[in-house]
Curated annotation (Swiss-Prot):
The keyword ATP-binding applies. It comes from the Bacteria. A type II topoisomerase that negatively supercoils closed circular double-stranded (ds) DNA in an ATP-dependent manner to modulate DNA topology and maintain chromosomes in an underwound state. Negative supercoiling favors strand separation, and DNA replication, transcription, recombination and repair, all of which involve strand separation. Also able to catalyze the interconversion of other topological isomers of dsDNA rings, including catenanes and knotted rings. Type II topoisomerases break and join 2 DNA strands simultaneously in an ATP-dependent manner. Its cofactor is Mg(2+); Mn(2+); Ca(2+). This is DNA gyrase subunit B. Mg(2+) 2 binds at D403, D405. It is found in: Cytoplasm. Binds two Mg(2+) per subunit. The magnesium ions form salt bridges with both the protein and the DNA. Can also accept other divalent metal cations, such as Mn(2+) or Ca(2+). Its main location: cytoplasm. Belongs to the type II topoisomerase GyrB family. It comes from Eisenibacter elegans.
Length: 478
């Protein structure tokens, strides 16, 4: 309804009507014209007429609601979720002050948990917040703010010393996780404008390297926010924008202001283009490294890593691969496995932290090469030369099995990071698992029991040892 709201989340959103229908009690209180008006509802039905309940010298609306416990299994709100969303909204709507108070608990001084969210810089501050743990390449974010036709466009972007792309997009304050036409417009403008500048500067010709769109986005953090009167989303969840006019609006705004920025800031422009050239060189090196890993696999036939204790079954649906921490753990894992369907691959030490390494170095890493070879995966499909190809995947269960200590947690995190960044399809298709190691083994005589917590350990001791004979129980901490 454009007469009521200039922009909104569009149809089918979880607005006040939906919240009202799903609440056992909703109270709407409105301050206007010197009075306080109030109406109560239950499961969407008015419990009486609108009443005047007092006088007021201000304006505003308060909504109080209690979720219906007959509909929701859980009616408890997570403070962190609400806090994160309000912080996000404060950046997207600069100059607006939002407050969050949790009345459920108090601290030692009897105070309720309270936060205030306010952003004067808007998306520029948002980008700095997102990049707070990275080293920036530019002294300040590049800021785009322009209305193209009927579409207000705001973008903030900055480059950092990482190798990943982080682009966050919003339409009418809704987070469009899957992107859409506004992100397409941004990428088109970024690639074209930077390519044009790089060509004119002569830096590309000097470097003798071929650039692709991905190279312009390595180490980029950006937030895109547009306002559209009638948003068209693909799917009910509103995670992808479909409005075709958003492409041109974002493209025009970003092209114009980014072009000015590059001309007026030649030092920063040179840093960006140097970063792009390095990304292109690293991409070509990574492609060669990937091809080398795959060529060895092909030329070697069924040559598998020497440390792999493979299983006898060849049906991937029945086979499991355990990635274990070191040779000693690999030895005990081999002793305890069922060799018909369980394979063991010991990994030596901590694998490479792929979050901080260039891609070509990843495929040179011995442990990562062993994992790729053992799993049988390749890179490259008809649609995408970098995409993971799972047609020859040898195991449908890949289990990360590390120790229950700090080192084990670190190794597990490094392995998960590799899979998330370079083999996400394995996670999405449900092939990746994490083993939950016990913390203790409790022994008494020939009896051995495992415990996954201190409480479970104590319960086992009470169960197997008479009172006063606890010393007869042996406990080993893993």
């Amino acid at each position: 309804d454009k007469d009521t709201y200039k922009v909104s989340g569009g149809l089918h959103g979880v607005g006040v009507s939906c919240v009202n229908a799903l609440s056992s009690l909703l109270v709407a209180t409105v301050h206007r014209e010197g009075k306080v008006f109030q109406q109560k509802y239950s499961t969407g039905n008015p419990q009486g007429a609108v009443e005047v309940v007092g006088q007021s010298d201000r304006t505003g609306t308060t909504i109080y609601f209690e979720p219906d416990a007959t509909i929701f299994a859980t009616t408890e709100y997570k403070y962190e979720t609400v806090s994160k969303r309000l912080r996000e909204l404060s950046y997207l709507n600069k100059g607006i002050r939002l407050t969050l108070t949790d009345l459920r608990e108090t601290d030692e001084q009897g105070r309720h948990l309270y936060e205030e969210f306010f952003s004067e810089g808007g998306l520029k501050e948002f980008v700095e917040h997102l990049d707070s743990t990275r080293q920036p390449l530019l002294p300040a974010p590049i800021h785009v703010e322009k209305t193209d036709g009927d579409i207000p466009v705001e973008v903030a972007l900055i480059y950092n010393n990482s190798y990943s792309e982080n682009v966050f997009s919003y339409v009418n304050n809704i987070n469009t996780h899957e992107g859409g036409t506004h992100v397409s417009g941004f990428r088109r403008a970024l690639t074209r404008t930077l390519k044009s500048y790089a060509d004119k500067s002569g830096m590309l010709e000097k470097a003798k390297v071929e650039i692709t769109g991905d190279d312009f986005r390595e180490g980029l953090t950006a937030v895109i926010s547009i306002k559209v009167a009638e948003p068209q989303f693909e799917g009910q969840t509103k995670t992808k924008l479909g409005n075709s006019d958003a492409i041109g609006a974002v493209d025009n705004a970003v092209s114009e202001i980014l072009g000015y920025y590059l001309e007026e800031n030649p030092r920063e422009a040179k840093l960006i283009i140097q970063k792009v050239i390095l990304a292109a060189q690293a991409r070509q090196a990574a492609r060669k490294a990937r091809e080398m890993v795959q060529r060895k696999n092909v030329m070697g036939g069924t040559s598998l890593p020497g440390k792999l204790a493979d299983c006898s079954d060849t049906n991937p649906e029945r086979c499991e691969l355990y990635l274990v921490e070191g040779d000693s753990a690999g030895g005990s894992a081999k002793q305890g496995r069922d060799r018909s369907f369980q394979a063991i691959l010991p990994l030596r030490g901590k694998i490479l932290n792929v979050e901080k390494a260039q891609e070509y170095k990843i495929y040179d890493n011995e442990e990562i090469k062993n994992m790729i070879t053992a799993m049988g995966v390749t890179f490259g499909t008809e649609e995408d030369s970098k995409a993971l190809n799972l047609t020859k995947l040898r195991y449908h269960k890949i289990i990360i099995m590390t120790d229950a200590d700090v080192d084990g947690s670190h190794i597990r995190t490094l392995i998960l990071t590799f899979f998330f960044r370079y083999m996400r399809e394995l996670i999405e298709q449900g092939y990746l698992y994490v083993a939950l190691p016990p913390l203790y083994i409790v022994k008494k005589g020939k009896e051995e029991r495992y415990a996954w917590s201190d409480a479970e350990r104590d319960a086992i001791i009470r169960e197997i040892a008479p009172e006063g004979k606890e010393d007869s129980v042996g406990i080993q901490r893993y």
